[in-house]
From Swiss-Prot:
Coiled-coil region list: none
Alphabetical UniProt keywords: Cytoplasm, Magnesium, Metal-binding, Pantothenate biosynthesis, Transferase
The name this protein goes by in its record: 3-methyl-2-oxobutanoate hydroxymethyltransferase 1
Cofactor(s) named in the record: Mg(2+)
Gene: panB1
Cofactor detail note: Binds 1 Mg(2+) ion per subunit.
């Protein structure tokens, strides 16, 4: 492949420069095949710690480990050629101190090849965000409904629905920008609040259950295509029923095997040709 035809991956600088220009498309991916599909349209692929719930059947994201995120992040980077890949820092790998956050983030980027990390929090994580960005690690912040903090906030509930909560979310987003974040994910907040944050910040906001006014949107891909039906958030729009398609294919396969119609000759090697064994007579003797 020549230098003129080589695909150029989007950088965090390019993503940041899109503020106010069009809408960023973002989706999640946890594997190389899914990343390859999403990469055809996405500006940003987020390797979310939601992998624990979507792929591993966990009840929440708290059990996801850094090793898991590194394995899935590396797979996504291998599968995606042009999107900016951002990988979540999982629970308990960054909250203790800026130094802990740096160790986790540095290892994650070094072992995956991703372009940035995402962490939950703004105001309380400002020191960590600043510590990372000053040392060359791009950070995407996450405010509003923060799944890693669901136990402390009363579950998966919309945030910013009253003046006090709204002020806290707004301050968190502003703190994240001031600390050096290149983008902010706003999840599960009052629409007017997400709109106000977007109008205030000079970095792109990416909404998930937030506002159409955000600079971009993200959904969990399996939610969007109907491949995960354990729970469907209110803010998800389903564009397909992938589970139904896969279920039909699996049932058809089982039927064909039980009826003896699979495999067909086209699926076999040398079907119908007589068996020839060199040295078979000698072996029998």
């Amino acid at each position: 492949m020549s230098a003129h035809t080589r695909t150029t991956r989007k950088t965090v600088t390019a993503i940041r420069s899109t503020k106010g220009i069009g809408s960023l498309v973002s989706l999640t991916a946890y594997s190389a095949p899914m990343a390859k599909l999403v990469d055809e349209v996405a500006d940003v692929i987020i390797v979310g710690d939601s992998v624990g719930m979507v792929l591993y059947g966990m009840p929440d994201t708290l059990r996801v480990t850094l090793d898991m995120m590194i394995a899935h992040g590396a797979a996504v980077v291998r599968g995606a050629a042009q999107a900016c890949v951002v990988v979540d820092l999982p629970f308990s790998t960054y909250q203790e101190s800026p130094a802990q956050a740096y160790r986790s983030a540095a290892r994650l980027l070094a072992e995956t090849g991703a372009q940035g990390v995402k962490l939950e929090g703004g105001t309380e994580m400002a020191d960590a965000i600043r510590f990372l960005t000053e040392r060359g690690i791009p950070v995407m912040a996450h405010v509003g409904l923060m799944p890693q903090q669901a136990n402390a906030t009363g579950g998966f509930r919309a945030q910013g629905m009253d003046p006090r909560s709204a002020a806290q979310v707004f301050d968190a987003a502003c703190s994240a920008e001031q600390a050096g974040a290149f983008s902010v994910v706003i999840e599960g907040t009052a629409e007017a609040l997400a709109r106000h944050i977007t109008e205030t910040l000079t970095i792109p906001t990416i909404g998930i259950g937030a506002s159409p006014a955000c600079d971009g949107q993200v959904l969990v891909t399996e939610d969007m295509i109907g491949a995960f039906d354990a729970y469907t958030p209110r803010f998800v729009k389903r564009y397909a029923d992938a589970n139904a398609v896969m279920r039909d294919a699996i049932r058809q396969y089982a039927h064909d095997v039980r009826q003896g119609v699979f495999p067909e000759p086209a699926h076999c090697f040398g079907y119908g040709k007589p068996l020839q064994l060199v040295g078979a007579a000698d072996a029998a003797a």
